[in-house]
Amino acid sequence: MAVQGGLLSLWLWLWLSLLTVLLGARARWRGEGTTPHLQSIFLGRCAEYTTLLSLGNKNCTAIWEAFKGVLDKDPCSVLPSDYDLFINLSRHPIPRDKSLFWENNHLLVMSYGENTRRLVALCDVLYGKVGDFLSWCRQENASGLDYQSCPTSEDCENNAVDSYWKSASMQYSRDSSGVINVMLNGSEPKGAYPTRGFFADFEIPYLQKDKVTRIEIWVMHDVGGPNVESCGEGSVKILEDRLEALGFQHSCINDYRPVKFLMCVDHSTHPDCIMNSASASMRRESASLHAIGDASLLISLLVALASSSQA
């Protein structure tokens, strides 16, 4: 009995020890941990961007030093204002009519913008590029970065990554001018325009009305749907009414054709894309008919000239 009791106690001790280890290994926060090699990625992106866009007046090392100050702060005590120096050192002009705001279609926006060749989204300006798709935060009760998890808005409002994007969004809006393009996802189940989100809370309020000509909304639907919302419907109507109340000239287009063409590149035979292909075929056939007609006319003229010369 004593042996059995000892084995039971040992088993219980091992079980409790394992449980303690497992609980200790659980992530503290809901978000991804700090991206490995954060500094190297940051500096590499900065160097590439400033070289390609000829921003020779930017000091990437100084920009990193300004950014990394937040890495010494409690992970739930980082404010947008903590990025002020970083923003001031990294900001640069955005070409007029080239700003592209968005919600729920990050990758499509990146593809269409094509590294600032067509349009310039927030992730295409220097202060957005260096942090895009990255995560960072300090450990909660210790120095050093937390590579296991970082807080999201569900954990605390003033987390390092959300505060970064809030600060960047506000500056991006202030620097935008002319025609403002907005790409929304009309297939998003929760609605194309989140009434609480970065665009609604940290971009629209900071647009400079005297610098904005008009706002053009593109409601894009996934190839194959679903078509949850379109212009004048649901949350899109809420956005249109808000812009109207703020005094902005605005328009709305469902499935803006240049973007839709890009979406159809990988779905050329899908029914949603067939009309585009058919239109192109019709244009090709029309061009061929014109060419045939021109050739026939030329032959007729040559025959007529030959006949008149023989006469």
UniProtKB/Swiss-Prot annotation:
MF annotations from Gene Ontology: NAD+ nucleosidase activity, cyclic ADP-ribose generating; transferase activity
Keywords: Cell membrane, Disulfide bond, Glycoprotein, GPI-anchor, Hydrolase, Lipoprotein, Membrane, NAD, Signal, Transferase
Protein residues bound to nicotinamide: 102
Chain positions carrying an annotated carbohydrate: 59, 88, 141, 185
Annotated signal sequence range: 1-24
EC code: 3.2.2.6
Subcellular locations according to the entry: Cell membrane
Membrane topology label: Lipid-anchor; GPI-anchor
Expression across tissues: Expressed in the bone marrow, spleen and thymus in lymphoid organs, and the lung, kidney and heart in non-lymphoid organs.
Residues holding NAD(+): 102, 165, 203
Ranges in coiled-coil conformation: none
InterPro entries attached to this UniProt entry: ADP-ribosyl_cyclase
Propeptide: 287-311
Residue positions bearing lipid (GPI-anchor amidated serine): 286
Disulphide bridges, residue numbers: 46-60, 76-156, 137-150, 231-252, 264-273
Function comment: Catalyzes both the synthesis of cyclic ADP-beta-D-ribose (cADPR) from NAD(+), and its hydrolysis to ADP-D-ribose (ADPR). Cyclic ADPR is known to serve as an endogenous second messenger that elicits calcium release from intracellular stores, and thus regulates the mobilization of intracellular calcium. May be involved in pre-B-cell growth.
PANTHER family: ADP-RIBOSYL CYCLASE (PTHR10912), ADP-RIBOSYL CYCLASE_CYCLIC ADP-RIBOSE HYDROLASE 2 (PTHR10912:SF4)
Protein name: ADP-ribosyl cyclase/cyclic ADP-ribose hydrolase 2
The organism of origin for this protein: Mus musculus (Mouse)
